[in-house]
Amino acid sequence: MLKYAIIFAIISLIAGALGFSGVAAGAAGIAKILFFLFLVVAVIFIVLAVLGVGAARSVMK
């Protein structure tokens, strides 16, 4: 799950960079939503990995 947290963080950074660079005005709003969505998912996965809950246990071993 920690792998997915890192993937979500990278996707949110890329979405933010593309959305705020002036490529498209509409993409900025979508990038903001995706950034916060993936940020929340990444934080949840990191917390689960640290606590050793579910499949995150095998990642931390």
Swiss-Prot record:
This is UPF0391 membrane protein Aave_0978. Its main location: membrane. It is found in: Cell membrane. One of its GO terms (cellular component) is plasma membrane. Keywords: Cell membrane, Membrane, Transmembrane, Transmembrane helix. HAMAP family: UPF0391 (MF_01361). It comes from the Bacteria.
